[in-house]
Regions:
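Short secondary-structure boundary segments
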Residues: 221-222, 245, 267-268
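Active-site loop ensemble at the mouth of alpha/beta enzyme cores that anchors a bound cofactor
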Residues: 278-282
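Cys/His-rich Zn2+-binding cysteine-cluster or related metal-binding knuckle/ribbon modules and their
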Residues: 249
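Acidic/glycine-rich phosphate/pyrophosphate-binding loops and surrounding catalytic core
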Residues: 1-212, 217, 226-234, 239-242, ...
């Protein structure tokens, strides 16, 4: 079992335990165990669909006898009135899986919709939009999947798959040179093949990084577009570049036109609105 599926399965199991507890007594009290039925996933708002594959796993994990017919795949732009899938099986199973499936699909589709909007604004530039670790606890893997479905690029998944030396790391380590040197020594000692990124707050710190080297990417933190343009010129293609901090949808293109490789946007995941949809008997 790969790590991604393992995390998703754990999330599904936890969500069912949280929601159902010792039983869905509403359903169990009024729906016969033998009753069979069908439900449609109805789209009620324009956006980008995401989470279909996870929804299939939710149904299968709860009741492998449920049958799912998919009409619209992940990444497709949808409109109100579209029917994304049909699910057939025991009515008790349909009712007990409905809320978890909708919670996941609405959240993922909202993120994919937001990401697509940002990605489209970057068309014609070299810049890609990145997500961050500003995610819902326990749902990061799904939210980062949604970013990719929407056309964005995942930054590191967690603290384990990349070294990102932020301002606090630099300050606690005693400066940029010590932070980079220790990070490189750590990777060598531990046999870790990890990319190293460092955040800089001004041109002095940027010049220190350029003089020392030893990193893969430089993040410009809270730079203005004018500062970013100069910073990109200073880096001169030697390292990947990333803009972060205070960048809005309205200013996104201004930063991209400075020539940065990536722009990280926490808003893709931390404050997104779910896409409206419903799961109705048919």
């Amino acid at each position: 079992m790969n790590k991604e599926k393992e995390l998703i399965d754990k999330l599904i199991d936890l969500a069912f335990a949280e929601d159902i507890g010792d039983g869905d007594h509403t359903t169990l009290s009024c729906i016969p165990a033998t009753a069979m039925g069908k439900s449609n996933l109805l789209i009620k708002e324009a956006g980008v669909l995401a989470g279909i594959e996870v929804a299939k796993e939710i149904f299968n994990r709860f009741d492998p006898t449920m049958k799912v017919e998919v009409f619209i795949n992940d990444g497709t732009e949808v409109e109100p009135g579209d029917v994304a899938m049909l699910v057939e099986g025991k009515v008790q199973s349909l009712l007990q899986t409905e809320r978890l499936m909708l919670n996941v699909m609405q959240r993922m589709s909202g993120i994919a919709t937001m990401t697509r909007k940002y990605a489209k604004k970057l068309e014609g530039t070299r810049t890609h939009v990145l997500d961050t670790r500003k995610t819902t606890p326990g749902m990061r893997i799904l939210e980062k999947m949604a970013v990719k479905i929407g056309g964005g690029v995942n930054h590191r998944i967690g603290l384990f798959d990349m070294i990102l030396l932020k301002d606090n790391h630099v300050d606690f380590a005693g400066g940029i040179d010590k932070a980079i040197t220790r990070a490189k020594e750590y990777c060598k000692e531990k046999g870790k093949d990890l990319k190293i990124e460092i955040e800089v707050r001004n041109f002095d710190e940027l010049q220190q990084v350029l003089d020392l080297g030893g990193v893969d990417r430089i993040m410009f933190d809270n730079f203005t577009p004018e500062m970013t343009k100069k910073a990109v010129e200073m880096v001169a293609g030697k390292y990947e570049t990333e803009s972060s901090g205070g960048i809005t949808f309205d200013t996104l293109r201004d930063y991209a036109e400075c020539g940065v490789d990536f722009i990280s946007v926490g808003a893709l995941t931390h404050s997104v609105k779910g896409l409206d949809m419903s799961f109705k008997a048919c």
